[in-house]
């Protein structure tokens, strides 16, 4: 009985050691592409499948499919299709630059800049047209209906060129109405006496506002100059510069 058990156990051990023919990872069919030269490999070499270096499928460097560098399909650098180096439509059409209109140029001009051809006058920033009552319903209604035709910016010179507010406002009103009238008349629109009367009132209010704004800025600049020109401040600044440089 013991001899039979030993013989059976030895026979089972020899069966496990014997190589099995065929099957995965044997000499017949291997993955990926290993084993005998005649086996079936994936990916196959020298064939014509997808992604191969010498085939004719999609994306191959020497094939003729879409997107290949030497093919003839769309978007290829040496092909003859649309957008290719050898094609007739190899560049996008560049859009023409938009023309800059006078309206855009005027809108881009900074408020307070010196206006050329007006002898040193500056153009103030845009304002909301004031609500003015003229004493009767007709003129009040006329103003509300036509206020968009009147100026919303004024021309002025620096406040330090005038001795008082009245002179500033008088000059501001005259030059603003003159410029606005000339510009509007050139466009083929005329003003009536009522228009001129209302423009004088509107522009006068805006010129007063502009004077107050410019006067405040002028005095602030003057105060800053006086502050920094005082001897204690100059001494302090000099000491700080000495500490930084030294």
UniProtKB/Swiss-Prot annotation:
Record PROSITE patterns: PRION_1, PRION_2
Residues where Cu(2+) 4 binds: 78-80
Topology with respect to the bilayer: Lipid-anchor; GPI-anchor
Pfam family, one: Prion
One GO BP annotation of this record: protein homooligomerization
Gene Ontology molecular function, alphabetical: copper ion binding
Connected disease: PrP is found in high quantity in the brain of humans and animals infected with the degenerative neurological diseases kuru, Creutzfeldt-Jakob disease (CJD), Gerstmann-Straussler syndrome (GSS), scrapie, bovine spongiform encephalopathy (BSE), transmissible mink encephalopathy (TME), etc.
Protein's recorded name: Major prion protein
Lineage: Eukaryota, Metazoa, Chordata, Craniata, Vertebrata
Gene coding for it: PRNP
């Amino acid at each position: 009985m013991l001899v039979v058990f030993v013989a059976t156990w030895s026979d089972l051990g020899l069966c496990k050691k014997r190589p099995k023919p065929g099957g995965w990872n044997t000499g017949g069919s291997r993955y990926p592409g290993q084993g005998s030269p005649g086996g079936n490999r994936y990916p196959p070499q020298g064939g014509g499948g997808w992604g191969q270096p010498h085939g004719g499928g999609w994306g191959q460097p020497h094939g003729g499919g879409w997107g290949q560098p030497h093919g003839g399909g769309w978007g290829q650098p040496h092909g003859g299709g649309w957008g290719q180096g050898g094609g007739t439509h190899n560049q996008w059409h560049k859009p023409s630059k938009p023309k800059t209109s006078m309206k855009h140029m005027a809108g881009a001009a900074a408020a307070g800049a010196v206006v050329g051809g007006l002898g040193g006058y500056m153009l103030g920033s845009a304002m909301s047209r004031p609500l003015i009552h003229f004493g009767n319903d007709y003129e009040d209604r006329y103003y509300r209906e036509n206020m968009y035709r009147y100026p919303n910016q004024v021309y002025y010179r620096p406040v330090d060129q005038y001795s008082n507010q009245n002179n500033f406002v008088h000059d501001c009103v005259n030059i603003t109405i003159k410029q606005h009238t000339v510009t509007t008349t050139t466009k083929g629109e005329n003003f009536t006496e009522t228009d001129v009367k209302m423009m004088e009132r509107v522009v006068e209010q805006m010129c007063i506002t502009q004077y107050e704004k410019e006067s405040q800025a002028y005095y602030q600049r003057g105060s800053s100059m006086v502050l920094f020109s005082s001897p204690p401040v100059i001494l302090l600044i000099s000491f700080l510069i000495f500490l930084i440089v030294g």
